[in-house]
Amino acid sequence: MEKFDRKPQIADIPPKMVKKYGSGKMLIPSPRDIDEIIRSVGKGRLITQEQIREKLAEKYGVNITCPMTTGIFISKIIALMAEEKIRKGEGDVTPYWRVVGKNGVLNPKFPGGVEMQARRLEEEGHKIIYDRKPRVKDYQKYLVK
């Protein structure tokens, strides 16, 4: 829980990231902020990690949100906490499986890998295209705004 409640931080965009993102300010988000956004994604809907980062950057008035920490917090804190609640039979679970990558690609770093994410998404009515990188068919139609 300590890591979940860490405070967001704002820093200069590191020199090694300036070429890709430009100079300015970068948010190192809190898992709680990310969790709130994921919880707002209703059944049958999807959100990309990029959308999460954009929403947080706008909320905090910065240029970008750190892509690395966002991904780590989703797969290593939020998803694991959700799975623990599911295992214990508790309600109020963050639907982390609704977070997809670029082009609707499933996340192999989630608990249970792409297989579990695919199963949960299929249970919510999504069709999965199983190829080299499994992804949600027509994912753009289901993205939150």
Give names to the regions the model predicted.
Residues M1-K145:
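Nucleic acid-binding interface residues in structured DNA/RNA-binding domains
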